[in-house]
């Protein structure tokens, strides 16, 4: 199997702390670059776990269409700003961040006080603007998850009137692009390919970590296929061979042998395959000459039966 390597040729961190990594993967056999690119892209975009804001509680507010005295932004704007916060959590439990800010002030993500399990990635992201003589008291709920989770307004656990739910986007990878190109021709004239992949994350994880996690998930997904075992469904009998379906009449046996077998409820080759030579001799009026005749007839169509029951 062709051995390839992965090189990160570019890494950028923008003002909002999002990160971009560009990787070259190769050399690959023809067609493998597209296969690898599609598989990694699907895992990166839809299967990596991330952290997101799932609910917000604002003192004195019980619905998202309200306004807050002394705060420039309305509640919908504040919810949108909170939804765009980039945080990481090292626990699968619900974490809550709180702040109380008096004006005049621009309330930022870094003002939120979380436990040591949570880190705010972009602390300078604004949440609200508070005028002099006013204050803002805010509580933010963050959770870990995968993909996208819409608000469930029928969930009893989230039915508190002052807890404003947010559609949660847990995806830490914002964008994945890839291209393929041909590289040097290998010995024997077969062309090689190279995969160029660009990964953009929200800053809660590096592009390198995102690639590694996606690759490990693909390995876990495909590993069971390496040891496929056949399981017979209960109650389903295998199809009999064509020879087994041959009727007794087509074996051209003597009249004596044919009549004895018919009286013993033997109607086809399939029925005979359940007999041994000793079993044939136990059929009434069925002697060794008739038994030998049956053995020869079966051998002509490529079927043999055992001499005794113990050798079945």
UniProtKB/Swiss-Prot annotation:
GO terms for biological process: DNA-templated transcription. It catalyses: RNA(n) + a ribonucleoside 5'-triphosphate = RNA(n+1) + diphosphate. One of its GO terms (molecular function) is DNA-directed RNA polymerase activity. Its EC number is 2.7.7.6. Residues 236-312 are annotated as: Alpha C-terminal domain (alpha-CTD). It holds the Pfam family RNA_pol_A_CTD. Residues 1-229 are annotated as: Alpha N-terminal domain (alpha-NTD). GO terms for cellular component: cytoplasm; DNA-directed RNA polymerase complex. In cyanobacteria the RNAP catalytic core is composed of 2 alpha, 1 beta, 1 beta', 1 gamma and 1 omega subunit. When a sigma factor is associated with the core the holoenzyme is formed, which can initiate transcription. The N-terminal domain is essential for RNAP assembly and basal transcription, whereas the C-terminal domain is involved in interaction with transcriptional regulators and with upstream promoter elements. Belongs to the RNA polymerase alpha chain family. This is DNA-directed RNA polymerase subunit alpha. It comes from Synechococcus sp. (strain CC9311).
């Amino acid at each position: 199997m062709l051995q390839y390597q992965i090189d990160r040729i570019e890494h950028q961190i923008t003002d909002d702390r999002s990160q971009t990594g560009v990787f070259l993967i190769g050399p690959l056999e023809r067609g493998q670059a597209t296969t690898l690119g599609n598989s990694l892209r699907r895992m990166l975009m839809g299967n990596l776990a991330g952290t997101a804001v799932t609910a917000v509680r604002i003192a004195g507010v019980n619905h998202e269409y309200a306004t807050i005295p002394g705060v420039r932004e309305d509640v919908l704007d504040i919810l949108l700003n909170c939804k765009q916060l980039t945080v990481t959590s090292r626990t699968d439990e619900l974490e809550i961040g709180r702040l109380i800010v008096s004006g005049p002030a621009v309330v930022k993500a870094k003002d939120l006080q979380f436990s040591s399990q949570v880190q705010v990635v972009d602390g300078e992201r604004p949440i609200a603007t508070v005028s002099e003589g006013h204050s803002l008291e805010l509580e933010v709920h963050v959770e870990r998850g995968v993909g996208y989770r819409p608000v469930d307004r029928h969930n009893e656990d989230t039915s508190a009137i002052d807890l404003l739910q947010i559609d949660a986007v847990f995806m830490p990878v914002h964008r994945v692009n890839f291209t393929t190109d041909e590289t040097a021709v290998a010995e024997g004239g077969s062309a090689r390919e190279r995969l160029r992949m660009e990964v953009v994350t929200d800053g809660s994880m590096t592009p390198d970590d995102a690639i590694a996690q996606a690759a490990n998930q693909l390995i876990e997904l495909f590993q069971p296929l390496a040891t496929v075992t056949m399981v017979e469904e209960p109650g389903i009998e295998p199809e009999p061979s064509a020879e087994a379906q041959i009727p007794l009449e087509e074996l051209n046996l003597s009249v004596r042998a044919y009549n004895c077998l018919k009286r013993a409820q033997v109607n086809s080759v399939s029925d005979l395959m359940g007999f041994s030579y000793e079993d044939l001799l136990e059929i009434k009026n069925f002697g060794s000459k008739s038994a030998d005749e049956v053995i020869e007839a079966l051998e002509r169509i490529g079927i043999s039966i055992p001499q005794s029951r113990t050798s079945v």
